[in-house]
């Protein structure tokens, strides 16, 4: 005679061996190594398929129209897979690879249109990533869309003379996203995806920003693009970063109910002003300290780890640049 779990629990309870309600059926989870292998298999399958298509239809890479059509089709297929098979590891990774390939084909097609400038291509890419962010609910893909879409927008604005202020702009957007993580519970997952995408872009800018910035400035000079603010642009940008540091500390104090007239509030604002002054000479100090601060305030270990990594990486890079 077989006994179900509920009856067995009732018998044990009558004998005084257990107490309380019967435990729910355990949720069966796939081991992490199996999920990893399924994800890798999805990428391998997608790239084999794309390699076959690339060899058999080489004309796609040579025609702007064909590249745009095939790229858009791949993005559409990836969106369909994400929305219908969102829980499968193989399917989600396969769709992610298809989406990346589609995005690369779209960029390839846009670059082959001779009349289009870099800023126009970057704006189209930013709009594409915004659309994919809204259509695809996969968290990792959303982080990718937020990072690449923001990077494309930065590239477009840089070509219009806003290059010195881009780090401050990314920093402000990052701070706003994480300070409002819990403001809209229904959208908290999307806000976190935006926040992670922006912090990755911010860290990349901190690590390679100095070298890339000098190269970018030379390119803009040759292209005849004048920077807004002229010779004062770097100082204005550094002052903006310092102001954002003070603003973040002020918002966190308000959130915690600490008055500025109290001793802890005065100490926090004083420390923020000190970091802001240091940031005028080394903007990365203020940026990385805020990443650490927001990570600690929100209880986010990933942000804390990224903050520590970015602080150490920036200090190493800054020391190297002083040599």
Q: Which residue stretches match the model-derived regions?
A:
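Alpha-helical multi-pass membrane segments and their bilayer interfacial helix-loop junctions
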Residues: 1-323
């Amino acid at each position: 005679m077989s006994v179900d779990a509920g009856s067995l629990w009732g018998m044990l309870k009558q004998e005084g061996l257990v107490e309380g309600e019967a435990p729910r059926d355990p949720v069966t989870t796939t081991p992490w190594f199996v999920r990893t292998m399924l994800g890798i298999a999805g990428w391998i399958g997608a790239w084999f398929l794309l390699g076959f298509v690339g060899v058999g239809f080489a004309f796609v890479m040579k025609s702007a129209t064909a590249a745009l059509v095939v790229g858009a089709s791949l993005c559409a297929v990836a969106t369909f897979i994400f929305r219908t098979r969102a829980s499968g590891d193989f399917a989600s990774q396969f769709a992610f690879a298809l989406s990346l390939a589609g995005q690369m084909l779209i960029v390839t097609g846009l670059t082959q249109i001779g009349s289009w400038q870099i800023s126009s291509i970057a704006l189209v890419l930013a709009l594409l990533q915004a659309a994919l962010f809204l259509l695809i609910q996969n968290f990792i893909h959303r982080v990718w869309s937020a990072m690449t879409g923001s990077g494309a927008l930065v590239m477009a604005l840089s070509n219009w003379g806003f290059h010195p202020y881009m780090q401050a702009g990314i920093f402000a957007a990052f701070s706003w996203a994480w300070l409002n993580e819990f403001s809209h519970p229904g959208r908290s997952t999307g806000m976190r995806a935006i926040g992670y995408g922006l912090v990755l872009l911010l860290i990349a800018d901190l690590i390679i920003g100095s070298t890339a910035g000098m190269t970018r400035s030379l390119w803009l000079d040759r292209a005849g693009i004048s920077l807004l603010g002229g010779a004062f642009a770097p100082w204005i940008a550094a002052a903006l970063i310092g102001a954002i540091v003070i603003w973040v500390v002020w918002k966190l104090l308000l959130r915690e109910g600490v008055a500025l007239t109290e001793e802890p509030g005065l100490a926090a604002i004083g420390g923020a002003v000190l970091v802001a002054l240091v940031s005028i000479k080394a903007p990365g100090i203020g940026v990385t300290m805020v990443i650490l601060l927001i990570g600690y305030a929100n209880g986010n270990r990933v942000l804390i780890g990224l903050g520590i990594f970015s602080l150490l990486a920036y200090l190493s890079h800054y020391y190297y640049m002083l040599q």
